[in-house]
Design a protein with these regions (language model features):
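Noncatalytic scaffold domains of N-terminal-nucleophile
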Residues: 1-122, 127-129, 133-176, 240-241, ...
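Short Gly/Pro-enriched turn/cap motifs at secondary-structure boundaries
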Residues: 104, 179, 267-271
């Protein structure tokens, strides 16, 4: 994993573009309150937390927050599975019988509240050094991670040009490299706007097939053409052009699925 950049990025925006009418502590107070005292979760969150019980049990910090009313019975079930006393199917069934989250239940995250308090009080140093940094490094050491104290101290965010495109006359403004998401988003929209999506029933065979094929093409390009602009010249104008989208679409058949192994990245004409 990379060094967490959201904290530094948001603080940079606050510093560069904030009105100056509020302190950082004032702005962060509501988030701290929600983390410390809790808030009611919706049904989607409840279902999501319950579906990842087995994964959360692999990490003590996650388990105590996202498994409802965790107790020794749950830990005993996990240990029985680790010892080979339960099959994968039996393990899943026992976890499914554990008390589950319901819509409206209160989610409390005390550790997150403490982290937010340190950031609110000390800014970047409240995350990239001091107590929070120590906790991150402890986690790295315990789980063979790669982030070092020096990585945290040297991190700084930079402004990048956004990716701009259109979809049926709607303007798209998204993130630019090193994130690949913005370029792929525009590229995929460029491809699917050549189809009458309204005529397709949502989640129908035709609908899912088209989205799958479009994503296959886009991700093949991502693997070859996109990277950190400080080290790799990504052909953004080509990837986000309407003409390139039509060229890539010629590889799609609406009658059969393409094997992912048969999909190659498009030719980078800017290198010629």
């Amino acid at each position: 994993s990379g060094v967490p950049g959201t904290v530094n990025g948001l603080l940079k925006i606050f510093s560069d573009y904030g009105s100056g009418n509020f302190t950082l502590e004032e702005i962060m107070a509501p988030a701290i309150d929600y983390a410390e005292n809790g808030y009611p979760i919706n049904g989607v969150a409840a279902q999501g937390f319950d579906s990842y019980k087995a994964l959360f049990l692999n990490d003590e910090g996650s388990a105590k927050i996202f498994i409802k009313d965790i107790n020794n019975d749950i830990l005993d079930i996990q240990q029985a599975f680790i010892n080979g006393e339960l099959s994968q199917d039996e393990y899943g069934k026992k976890l499914a019988n554990i008390d589950e989250w319901q819509e409206g239940d209160i989610l409390i995250q005390k550790d997150l509240a403490n982290t937010l308090k340190r950031i609110a009080k000390n800014g970047n140093s409240g995350f990239y050094s001091g107590k929070t940094a120590e906790l991150i490094i402890q986690e790295m050491v315990a789980n063979n991670g790669f982030i070092t104290k020096e990585d945290l101290l040297s991190y700084h965010s930079v402004y990048r040009d956004p990716i701009i495109g259109t979809y049926r006359n709607n303007l798209i403004i998204s993130m630019g490299p090193p994130s690949s998401g913005g370029a792929l988003l525009v590229q995929m929209f460029n491809m699917i706007e050549n189809f009458d999506m309204k005529s397709m029933e949502r989640n129908s065979t035709e609908f899912v097939h088209l989205l799958t094929e479009v994503q296959r093409l886009a991700y093949a390009d991502r693997a070859i053409h996109l990277g950190d602009p400080d080290f790799w010249p990504s052909p953004i104008p080509m990837l986000t052009s309407k003409e390139y989208a039509k060229e890539r679409l010629s590889l799609i058949s609406m009658n059969s699925a393409t094997r992912s192994t048969e999909i190659a990245a498009g030719k980078n004409l800017s290198k010629e």
